[in-house]
Amino acid sequence: MKTSEFKTDIFNLFDQKWAVLTADTPDRWNAMTISWGSMGTIWGYPQNGRPIVTVYVDPLRYTYEVLNQSDSFTVSFFPEERRKDLIMMGSRSGRNGDRLKGSGLTPVNNHGFVTYKEAELTFECRKLFQQTLDNVTPHFKVPGYRRYAANWSSEN
């Protein structure tokens, strides 16, 4: 789908839907639920910006390790009736076992990107930039901030 055909309110996707971030390739991948992220454009003139997705991942998460070694990731959004499956994905670590098992989600390889048959919307992203958030302004920092001190921006 072309970005000009996209009719979803991107400002509410992360707030109102549950999402799964999936990193790496179908041979070696891991997924986690996410609720912090944003979408927009960068490096372009009006009508010609590069679409990006930015996600924030706790450095203690196993997906953080996998994402560090990957040049791509997907962000998949699911309908409300899949919330129970996503709770399963968000409650276990991929480091210690298969969190997909028992979730009811079906992974699909889409040209080297892992998505899910049950997803209603998936962004396939190539990593463009990553950094820790150590230098954010003091008013941004909230209790528990240190745990959420990394992010990735990508071109999709």
Features from the language model and the residues they span:
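Basic, polyanion-binding surface patches
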Residues: 1-156
